[in-house]
Amino acid sequence: MTLQQTIAEYLKYTGQKGLDISAALIDCDGVLYDSMKYHTQAWVKLMKKNGIKCTRDEFYEMEGMTGSEIIKMKFKTGAGKNITDDEAHALYGVKTRYFRELGEAPVMPGAVRVLQALKDADVERVLVTGSQQDTLLERIEKDFPGLFSEAKVTGHDVKRGKPNPEPFLKAMNKADKKPNQCIVIENAPLGVQAAHAAGCFTIGVTTGPIPEKDLFKAGADLVYKNMDELAAALPTLLVALSLVKA
């Protein structure tokens, strides 16, 4: 399928008459940082300490959910236990400690190039993440100075994490944008599902073990192998999107 056909297909299934891209809603873990391997390791450690059997692959598939949602679901299915909000908060604090003990996750190769290309095209960059870890969020300003707007949505801001579209709908509200004004950059099926449900043109990047086909199945309009490939393609993509005005 050509790029023009992909855009036409997006317009068809959303019912949009055109596009006017002025914002990019961008995930954090697995997009800006190569951090998912640390997260999955910390999650497995937390669960095993509490007698819950699991694998790292399970947590790659749950990426995008809030920490509280993951804890409540895993304790319910793995231990038959209903976890309160306070208990989930305390357990998430333990998981965060395990995550920190693994060291700082590196910046994802190509992430700065993608953000700079968007900035050069005057496309607002809005962070949309299910993360509730303040330590990781604090790194954004240090690692990507001047590359993000003040508008952002984290796991602290939503009641329902991805795949519910709430994070992206809230981000659009904060940035005063409509779905046909936004592209989304995501690496996980649940995030792609959420972006698709929100009506945004959705770009997947396969920065982890999840294959391209799973991102397309979740609703991605385009999928790139990594952030460097996306950075190289962005100028052409943004021009193509700009030619389909509402």
What label would you give each PLM region?
Residues M1-S22, Q116-K119, Q132-A246:
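Asp-based, Mg2+/Mn2+-dependent phosphohydrolase catalytic module
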Residues T2-Y60:
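Active-site neighborhood of HAD-like aspartate-dependent phosphohydrolases
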Residues E9, F75-R113:
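Metal-dependent phosphoesterase signature
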Residues T40, V44, G67-K72, Y92, ...:
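An amphipathic alpha-helix signature
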Residues I52-E61, A79-L91, G146-S149:
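Short, surface-exposed acidic
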